[in-house]
Amino acid sequence: VATADNDLTLAQWGAIKQAWGGCAYCGADASSMQKDCVQAISRGGRYTLGNVVPVCPSCNASKCNAEVTTWLRRKRLDERRFLERFVEINRELADRFGDV
């Protein structure tokens, strides 16, 4: 990923992981979270504060570059819960770090 596409700092990544407390998609334990772009890089997304969530390796591999809501429905995960938390957490992060 080019530098211009990776604006996420280590402090921001730590805050994101802490805010979610586990996999943003399935809720799995927070022990080995990976960065996932809600809007995939292949769809114009970037590794930025407002687009990255912590995910377990299984969800990360499964979602790949799929559109997040379509993927959540296909996996029968709670789309509404994810979207509500995503908005809430991004508001909190914006207050802490500036606009997301």
Residue ranges with predicted function:
Residues 1-22, 81-90, 94-97:
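Short, charged surface segments at domain edges that flank catalytic/cofactor-binding sites
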Residues 22-57, 63-75:
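Histidine-centered nuclease catalytic patch
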Residues 50, 61-100:
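A detector for short metal-coordination/catalytic motifs
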